[in-house]
A protein has these predicted regions:
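Glycine- and aromatic-enriched membrane alpha-helices
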Residues: 1-195
């Protein structure tokens, strides 16, 4: 999974410590899961789903800078990612967003944080390493470019899907559960809503 992604992506680079990339990836995921677990306790008890999303958030957060941050930077990126994912999921849920798995929070919010974190923790030019904030501009431009591209292509694809086969299921299918309506079985019986 993510080790192939982060470490494998660095194989094309010259003079990169692949083991260090694996370590920063692991540290950020661990810090993200621990922070998400403790942050999710604001609801009274630790939430396993949030803890797992915290690990993913740590992985997403470290991806942009996995080869350019040290271990402390990786832990700090993971800590922030873990808290961000919990607060973001809760916020979007309260606002009525339909994001059952927290994908916007994990990949969108924590991805933005990870790109900005490079400007802070990059050991060559990051804010904490004498860069004076010079990386913030390029990182922000990258975020805006990626966001514009993702929005435009997603909008186009979703419009095509909606105008052909439809983007939403019926209310009845949603209440019954997509596993039941599409496959005739229930994968997550504990999550069935009874009327």
């Amino acid at each position: 999974g993510w080790y192939g992604f982060n470490v494998g992506s660095a194989l094309a680079a010259v003079d990169v410590d692949l083991a260090a990339i694996a370590v920063t990836t692991t540290l950020s995921a661990a810090a993200g899961s621990i922070t998400a677990m403790y942050t999710s306790m604001i609801s009274g008890k630790p939430n396993v789903g949030m803890t797992l999303n915290g690990a993913l958030a740590g992985l997403v957060g470290i991806t942009a800078g996995c080869a350019n941050v040290n271990n402390l930077g990786a832990v700090l990126i993971g800590l922030v990612s873990g808290a961000l994912v919990v607060y973001s999921i809760n916020f979007l849920e309260k606002k009525g967003f339909d994001d059952a798995v927290g994908a916007v929070s994990v990949h969108g919010i924590c991805g933005i944080w990870g790109v900005l974190a490079v400007a802070i923790f990059d050991t060559s030019d990051g804010l904490f390493y004498g860069g004076g904030g010079t990386l913030f501009g390029p990182q922000l431009i990258g975020i805006l470019a990626i966001g514009a591209w993702a929005y435009a292509t997603s909008y186009l694809v979703f419009k095509v899907i909606d105008s052909t086969v439809g983007l939403r299921v019926t209310a009845e299918e949603e209440i019954a559960g997509l596993d039941a309506s599409e496959h005739g079985t229930s994968a997550y019986g504990d999550f069935i809503t009874k009327k």
